[in-house]
A protein has these predicted regions:
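Hydrophobic alpha-helical segments of small multi-pass membrane proteins
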Residues: 32, 62-65, 75
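Beta-rich strand-turn-strand
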Residues: 45-59, 64-68
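Short, well-structured beta-strand-loop connectors
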Residues: 42, 60-61, 76-77
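Flexible, glycine/small-residue-enriched loop-and-beta-strand segment within the central core
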Residues: 1-53, 79-80, 85-88, 92
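Terminal amphipathic alpha-helical/low-complexity segments used for targeting or macromolecular assembly
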Residues: 81-178
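Residue-identity detector for threonine
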Residues: 5, 24, 33, 58, ...
Length: 178
């Protein structure tokens, strides 16, 4: 259950021996293993080098260079990749930022297109305003189906409370906070 996004590379070898070969004629091969745990996200254009071990439940930011061992339940970024947050702290951060980012999305859409965005455009934010039932729009149902985690996502959704009573109530909030 690993998400490796566009333009990532995983290298289990090292061609730097070519310099040695040119200097001495020797071919001194170099290789190693790469281990990636379960429930890992690797951001775009990241590079995972030989000997890397990535623990379970790990997020790696875009453009990172992964070497050595990265413990699980954490967020890493940089070159070389360094721990920037526990996964728990990142989840708390996302819960706090979600509303502001949804508002920003609506404002940017309105500014660009001169009209309110269709509800379906906010497919990552529907937890903020959709009633708690399983009779959701197909676009939102598909979000549940990502990662073959439909049942767990639906259960979490139904057991949670929306911040707004409807999409219209959410849009009124956006208007009143402009």
């Amino acid at each position: 259950n690993v998400h490796i996004t566009a333009d990532c590379s995983i290298l289990q070898h090292d061609y730097s021996w070519a310099v040695i070969q040119r200097l001495t004629g020797e071919v001194l091969g170099s290789c190693g293993t790469v281990r990636i745990g379960n429930n890992v996200f690797v951001g775009q254009k990241s590079l995972i080098l030989k000997g890397a071990e990535i623990g379970d439940n790990t997020i790696i930011g875009a453009g990172s260079v992964v070497t050595g061992r990265l413990d699980g339940n954490a967020v890493y970024a940089g070159a070389p990749a360094k721990k920037i947050s526990s996964l728990e702290a990142y989840i708390d951060k996302r819960r706090k930022l979600q509303l502001n980012e949804a508002v920003l999305l609506v404002r940017e859409y309105e500014q660009t297109y001169g009209t309110r965005p269709p509800k379906k455009l906010l497919r990552e934010f529907f937890w903020l305003f959709e009633p708690r039932n399983t009779q959701l729009d197909e676009v939102f149902q598909k979000v549940f189906q990502l990662d073959n985690n439909t049942e767990r996502s639906q259960q979490a959704f139904v057991q949670s409370e929306p911040m707004f009573s409807s999409y219209e109530a959410f849009l009124k909030y956006v208007e009143s906070n402009s």
